[in-house]
């Protein structure tokens, strides 16, 4: 096990030597929009050819076109990009912001705390090297994407998103790949294809948000909404007892490689301000925070000493650094706190417990609720989106869907309408720990009381019996609520409830939640979702092993598992599944039946039902005879080519 010193040194080495890295057999390609500076990066996965006839020495091959998929890694997956974490990423969105002519550059930071940090020369060794002066809306101007959408303006960001969400759907012409189940969307209105105008309409309606602070021009436009691809958030951040700036930057880059659509910096330790600056300047995805965490640090962890003035200064500090969305626990009202007294696990939200303690100690209403309009005014000046925190979320399935949880949700529904008055983009946070039978009630109630504002949930976790495996227990609930209409899922790692996640934990959590999000997209009938499934299934049936790995969410692990038992080069082109060997692979048998039918010149699906049935029965009888002749063993040791076996889907 690495020591803290070794872990930090490894992270430092990682960022010092950071170079763009692409997944196997993939390349970075760009789709260009209506103007040259709208260049949408995609991951293009190349596939091998399929043998459709001939012999091994003279094969007849059919090409399988490359597949474009969503890529969250930004420049980190582009071999032509120049990466220097001390300079940050290219500010490619800066011109879009400037040409709107509704912002101005500030002479100095507005936050008193920021000014103190900049004046402290003792922090120079921690400071990001290339700081710029922040921007803010001009007097009387609103600079949010919601404001533009309501004015009927289709921004470059909206066009970028439409291209990104479509994933070059129009290029896919193979019916084997475009086939999909009808889907059950539970009232969602998914467009096919997704147009820039559709993006504008959804944002204007409040059903979707584009979290892009004007001070984070490095971020690539993305959208969070029920009628778009389900997104996944990854949490990183230091704590009072572990981690460093180097490690958090490493986790950021690592998170985007494995599909984080947004990243929340939940730092609670030393140097929160400096850590966040490094993260934002090097992030191609939107960054969220929970500002109350840093505000609490400013009063030495004493919740009772928090004030609106300290919190407001923290909002200014973070908005001018470029934070794209704030989690604000404004729905934790004084009268709701007693409702948690009979709970099995009380209040488990950190932000919720901080505000509950403040309310009780002062016997006053939550100052975040009282000053919510002030918060909205501030956010509108920087286009910071609001994520209304669920401070009363249940921390155990025993407390699910109780009075405290749903009372707060009603208040969040009131607050979202206030935020919309200020053209502030808003999403609603949700639970938590919910058994499967109560999940849909959560989604339905949120849609009703929050007027379809996007829902963003932590899981939900469906059972409480598996510490160390809560990415599984919550991934189940995440897939369900994604199907029902949740717009973004906050990942859970294997370390949930146990400790701060490391790099491998982050990857495990992300892969689990990308599966959940994708399963939700498929079930809803999203037009692009099933194409990748079909491409991988086709590769699996044709025994194109490398394509199977590369089309998957985690090519590295798939390849490693295969090579663990079948390391030989011959196994990588073997035309049988390795669980049952070459004699009893179900997919190989299916192929042989097809070949037999073709040899008999029977055209399946067009000939008579009798002939089709006859050929099928004849083929099965032949395989039955072979099975019995070889000992009638269910599993069979294969010959000299391959000695071991690999799992594939089989019936029974």
From Swiss-Prot:
It catalyses: 5-amino-1-(5-phospho-beta-D-ribosyl)imidazole + S-adenosyl-L-methionine = 4-amino-2-methyl-5-(phosphooxymethyl)pyrimidine + CO + 5'-deoxyadenosine + formate + L-methionine + 3 H(+). Its EC number is 4.1.99.17. It comes from the Bacteria. Substrate binds at residues 235, 264, 293, 329, 349-351, 390-393, 429, 456. Its cofactor is [4Fe-4S] cluster. NCBIfam families: PRK09284.1, PRK13352.1, thiC. Catalyzes the synthesis of the hydroxymethylpyrimidine phosphate (HMP-P) moiety of thiamine from aminoimidazole ribotide (AIR) in a radical S-adenosyl-L-methionine (SAM)-dependent reaction. This is Phosphomethylpyrimidine synthase.
